[in-house]
Curated annotation (Swiss-Prot):
InterPro entries associated with the record: ATPase_P-typ_cyto_dom_N, ATPase_P-typ_P_site, ATPase_P-typ_TM_dom_sf, ATPase_P-typ_transduc_dom_A_sf, HAD-like_sf, HAD_sf, Heavy-metal-associated_CS, HMA_Cu_ion-bd
Residues binding Mg(2+), per UniProt: 690, 694
Positions that bind Cu(+) 2: 83, 86
Protein name: Copper-exporting P-type ATPase
A single Gene Ontology CC term: plasma membrane
Length: 802
């Protein structure tokens, strides 16, 4: 190969030599390609002719075989975007770059998230490409205070607005003269005076629009800057023409439009300032989450307590936390006991009792006891850091509903410029033949009333505020796509253990005296069985002292037999009692049947071959589970329960909480198949679970919802995470989705409707340019303001909420 290039790809998913050989063989089948795949290093080295192939082709080939290619992600801060046409153009250019898998640009956050193949491109190339388009870009610095940066930018906008307003105010008075036939000083009507006021507004304050327009046009694009620059320049330079004609001795009074250009720019700056101010409020939820983080920690070093910055804490460090202090990082208690306020995570205001070996979460509040803890997760690995990451990703993601707006934004400005030119021609040739001014005014009005900004802000602002509000309530959406899909859910499938129930057995019923309970708990105390643990905990709550077992024997399938302090103990089922000639009174037999019918595990207790008690143990239903399921039913959502338990136990739990559909006796690997069956019936299914065996079903469902008290595997597989395990958050999550999508539709209706109605009205000459400019400025503000209403959203579902 005369002209060759070489690239190296990191491959994931190879398990043996057959994998590497298969990939190598497939790549080498391509013309002018020489590939070597190394299983040990998990890399493919490819020599190729760049005139025939590119790296993306090799990546697609590898992925088509079922393997992955390592992708890196970078977040970029972008400044200089003024409307949806800007963000749409940057996104389109980035996605066309070699090595970029996917790029999304968010106008509201002024950030881009780019997934790329490091062998083909890098973050610096991405930044350079954006800068060539005329925007400022930099790699996001997570240590930099984004809030203060935005506050400075907002202050700069305000200063420019004030200067522009001061210069434009006298010119604005001229408009009122025309409208209300008012008398003003002659100075105000002097062309030189108007020129002196309008020029700095046009070319100093408004220079940003010229720069933006030039950079966009140079790169073959067009945005709002083009509309503003063309519209205001037309008014300004026509006024210059009239002024020169007047200076050359024209006898007719000059028709000046300096006030139009200056006031237009001022109103647009005013709208941009209000928009930026409103947009800054959309990230308040994230700011509040960040403010929850502890700032320092008390570490135990050589027996001394030392305060250190939080970022200096390492895994394994021993920390002291006193009452009233925040838990600095995630960890485990090794000494002491306390109550911890975990409301920032769960929304539950009642403090949770914590003892030795219990886990504690960073940034929760220690209420009433000094504890010593070992740090287990620090920095970006803590629970709060992961929550913040999920919220950030959700707020910067795009919902599918935004696609139409993005497509339109890409063509919007050129179409509007074309319409304005057409309107000018129609007016000067047909409406007012030979008269220049009405044609100019109508075309300027068309240019300045058109607003691609509102289209670009309609979806991301609602997603940002909606996901932020949900996060404040313990509901974490992993992206805008999942916000949109959730509102379509009509069926929810709940795993039983750990989701509907608490996931740990407790004693629900006991009939017998304290001596029997003491002997029973002593017999069970050395067992690791969950039922035994429940009995021992119950005895401890009764403050009974447990002794030692002399002999112990398990009777498989029936129970246990033990000797304690010369007492012979039998604990088990009917068969165990019958085998030992112990008869059951009718009321005990009836109680046993009743407990079993309710899905409880009931055990008979005999001391010295005499029946002395009966105890029932069950995994209890979570608080509010019944209320949550009722709310889902009220919303018109079908609820089903999926469990590996037997049908009797499952039916008993379902009856308690009001679930009609029960799918029982299901093996873990069959859960995903059950979800698929429901989907084949045309249902939109959400699966709610907390365990490792729920992960395949969570992935298969249209929406996977993980309970935050569950395993990391389940949470990773889910689209929504419910913090703390409160089932009431499930209907709230669905309502948050519905409210957010409803808000997006309102915004899109306004954004489309405004342009569809505004442009024809302006074309008919019914709007003065300054009125059109004010309408354009306020259209974006109205969209952002409507989105901000979600901040006050009460997550209380309505009956059959649409």
């Amino acid at each position: 190969m005369a002209n060759t290039k070489k690239t190296t790809l990191d491959i994931t998913g190879m398990t043996c030599a057959a994998c590497s050989n298969r990939i190598e063989k497939k790549l080498n089948k391509l013309d002018d390609v020489n590939a070597q795949v190394n299983l040990t290093t998990e890399k493919a080295t490819v020599e190729y002719n760049p005139d025939q192939h590119d790296v993306q082709e090799f990546i697609n080939t590898i992925q088509h075989l079922g393997y992955g290619v390592t992708v890196e992600t970078v977040e970029l801060d972008i400044t200089g975007m003024t409307c949806a046409a800007c963000s749409s153009r940057i996104e389109k250019v980035l996605n066309k770059m070699n090595g970029v898998q996917n790029a999304t640009v968010n106008l509201t956050t002024e950030q881009a998230k780019v997934d790329y193949y490091p062998e083909e491109t890098d973050a610096d190339k991405l930044v350079t490409r954006i800068q060539k388009l005329g925007y400022d870009a930099s790699i996001k610095d997570n240590n930099k205070d984004q809030t203060s940066r935005k506050a400075e930018a907002l202050q700069h906008k305000l200063i420019k607005l004030i200067i522009s307003a001061v210069l434009s105010l006298p010119l604005l008075m001229l408009m009122f003269v025309h409208l209300f036939n008012m008398h003003i000083p002659a100075l105000f009507t002097n062309p030189w005076f108007q020129f002196i006021l309008a020029t700095p507004v046009q070319f100093i304050i408004g220079w940003q629009f010229y720069v933006g327009a030039y950079k966009n046009l140079r790169n073959g694009g067009a945005n709002m800057d083009v509309l503003v620059a063309v519209g205001t320049s037309a008014a300004y330079f026509y006024s210059i023409y009239e002024m020169v004609r007047w200076l050359n001795g024209s006898t007719t009074q000059p028709h000046l439009y300096f006030e139009t250009s200056a006031v237009l720019l001022t109103l647009i700056l005013f709208g941009k300032y209000l928009e930026a101010r409103a947009k800054s409020q959309t990230t308040n939820a994230l700011g509040e989450l960040l403010s929850l983080q502890a700032k320092e920690a008390r570490i135990l070093k050589d027996g001394n307590e030392v305060m250190i910055p939080l970022n200096e804490v390492h895994v394994g460090d021993t920390l002291i936390v006193k009452p009233g202090e925040k838990i600095p990082v995630d960890g485990k208690i090794i000494k002491g006991m306390t109550a911890i306020d975990e409301s920032m995570l769960t929304g539950e205001s009642i403090p949770v009792e914590k003892n030795v070996d219990d886990t504690v979460i960073g940034s929760t509040m220690n209420k009433n006891g000094t504890i010593t803890m070992t740090a287990t997760k620090v920095g970006g690995d803590t629970a709060l850091a992961n929550i913040i990451k999920v919220v950030e990703e959700a707020q910067s993601s795009k919902a599918p509903i935004q696609r139409l707006a993005d497509i339109i934004s890409g063509y919007f400005v050129p179409i509007v410029v074309g319409i304005a030119l057409l309107i000018f021609i129609v007016w000067i040739t047909l409406v007012t033949p030979g008269t220049f001014e009405p044609a100019l005014v109508a075309s300027i009005s068309v240019l300045v009333i058109a607003c691609p900004c509102a289209l670009g802000l309609a979806t991301p602002t609602s997603i940002m505020v909606g996901t932020g509000r949900a996060a404040e309530n313990g509901i974490l959406f992993k992206g805008g796509e999942f916000v949109e899909r959730t509102h379509q859910i009509d069926t929810i499938v709940l795993d039983k253990t750990g989701t509907i129930t608490n996931g740990r057995p407790v004693v629900t019923d006991y009939h017998g005296d304290n001596q029997t309970l003491q002997l029973l708990a002593t017999a069970e105390k050395d067992s690791e069985h969950p039922l035994a643990e429940a009995i021992v905990n119950y005895a401890k709550e009764k403050q009974l002292t447990l002794t030692e077992t002399t002999t112990f024997k398990a009777v498989p399938g029936h129970g246990i037999e033990a000797t304690i302090d010369h007492h012979h103990i039998l604990v088990g089922n009917r068969k165990l009692m019958a085998d030992n000639d112990i008869s059951l009174p009718k009321h005990i037999s009836d109680d046993l049947t009743h407990y079993e019918r309710d899905g409880k595990t009931a055990m008979l207790i005999a001391v010295n071959y005499s029946l002395t008690g009966i105890i029932a143990v069950a995994d209890t239903v979570k608080d509010h589970a019944k209320d949550a399921i009722k709310q889902l039913h009220d919303m018109g959502i079908e609820v089903a329960m999926l469990t590996g338990d037997n049908k009797n136990t499952a039916q008993a739990i379902a009856k308690q909480v009001g679930i009609d559909t029960v799918i029982a006796d299901i093996l873990p690997e069959e859960k995903a198949a059950q979800i698929a069956k429901l989907q084949q019936q045309g249902k939109k299914v959400a699966m709610v679970g907390d365990g490792v065996n729920d992960a395949p079903a969570l992935v298969k469902a249209d929406i996977g919802i993980a309970i935050g008290t569950g395993t990391e595997v389940a949470i990773e597989a889910a689209d929504i995470t419910i913090l703390g395990g409160d089932l009431m958050l499930i209907p709230k999550a669905i309502y948050a989705s519905k409210a957010t999508i409803r808000n997006i539709r309102q915004n899109l209706f306004w954004a489309f409707g405004y342009n569809i109605a505004g442009i024809p009205i302006a074309a008919l000459g019914l709007l003065a340019p300054w009125v059109a400019g004010a309408a354009m400025a306020l259209s974006s503000v109205s969209v952002v303001t409507n989105a901000l209403r979600l901040k006050k959203m009460r997550l209380e579902p309505r009956r059959k909420d649409a």
